[in-house]
Regions:
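Glycine-centered secondary-structure boundary/capping sites
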Residues: 78, 105, 125-128, 180, ...
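N-terminal targeting sequences that direct proteins away from the cytosol to non-cytosolic compartments
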Residues: 2-123, 223, 230-261
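Solvent-exposed, non-transmembrane segments of extracytoplasmic/periplasmic domains
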Residues: 90-166
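Detector for Asparagine
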Residues: 7, 56, 82, 92, ...
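Signature of long, low-cysteine stretches enriched in small and polar/charged residues
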Residues: 136-223
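Alpha-helical structural elements
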Residues: 37, 43, 49, 105, ...
């Protein structure tokens, strides 16, 4: 093979490599234009999940329980519920909650609904530019209540992000995950994390009572009220909290009639 032939082959090889590299660069550029946001969101999600593995936890739905019969009630902050346990508890009020303590060892902490943060209203009444961004990001799937906000936030997980997903969905997921990091959980979710969407009451349960752990509840009624409860037992108590106890409480939350206030 002559030197001229070798040079010609080298030039052809170099030209082919240059064309291939150019095509790759074009494909990468097209991908980044079309999927750059999604890819960045996907990478961020993986990074956040590695640092905070609980981000991958989403609530498991609880089935709707049967109706609850009328029974003894507990009252606090102009609301009432059916007492989850028999007996006459000793109320221990504080500025933000009332703790009902039973002689059998159970305690129900009822937090003041009026002291709960109205997150959605804070967003709506905040910086107009930020609210406009919020409206634009969630235009396809509007959030119209605090329950809907928590439902979407707690239901988001990095595993739901894909580099080839819709761009607006990627932006929405990015915001939801940032909020999830900010909101955190009321109790550790490795003991159970559940959601309920029943007539008149909706929300989340942190903890499985069958595991003998405290249970926290964050609930929302159809009138915009927010409720938080903690159910626990003293270390020396042999009495257990059951899911029926929790259901009884949730299904009977209602305002105290004005005549009884």
């Amino acid at each position: 093979m002559t030197i001229e032939t070798m040079n010609d082959e080298t030039e052809k090889s170099s030209s082919t490599e240059a064309i291939v590299l150019a095509l790759v660069a074009i494909l990468v550029a097209v991908f980044m234009v079309k999927f750059g946001l999604q890819t960045l969101t996907w990478v961020e999600g993986k990074t956040w999940a590695a640092q905070s593995p609980w981000l991958n936890t989403v609530p498991q739905p609880l089935p709707a329980p049967p109706a609850v019969a009328a029974g003894p009630q507990l009252k606090a902050f102009d609301f009432e519920i059916n007492a989850p346990w028999p007996g006459t508890p000793k109320p221990n009020p504080s500025e933000t909650n009332v703790a009902f303590r039973y002689d059998t060892g159970q305690t129900l902490v009822f937090f003041d609904p009026g002291a709960q943060v109205d997150t959605l209203r804070s967003i709506q009444n905040g910086n107009p530019a930020e609210f406009q961004k919020f409206t634009n990001i969630f235009a396809g799937k509007p959030i119209d209540s605090n329950y809907a906000l928590y439902r979407d936030v707690y239901g988001a997980a990095p595993s739901q992000i894909s580099p080839i997903m819709n761009g607006s969905d990627a932006m929405r997921m990015n915001v939801l995950l940032l909020w999830k990091l900010s909101f955190g959980f009321d109790l550790r979710t490795d003991t159970g994390f559940y959601s309920f969407d029943w007539p008149n009451i909706h929300g989340f349960q942190f903890g499985d009572p069958a595991k003998g752990v405290p249970v926290a509840l964050r609930a929302f009624d159809d009138r915009g009220h927010q409720f938080r409860f903690i159910l626990t037992t003293s270390p020396d108590s042999t009495t257990k909290i059951t899911q029926d106890d929790i259901n009884k409480l949730l299904l009977t939350i209602q305002p105290v009639p004005f005549i009884d206030r």
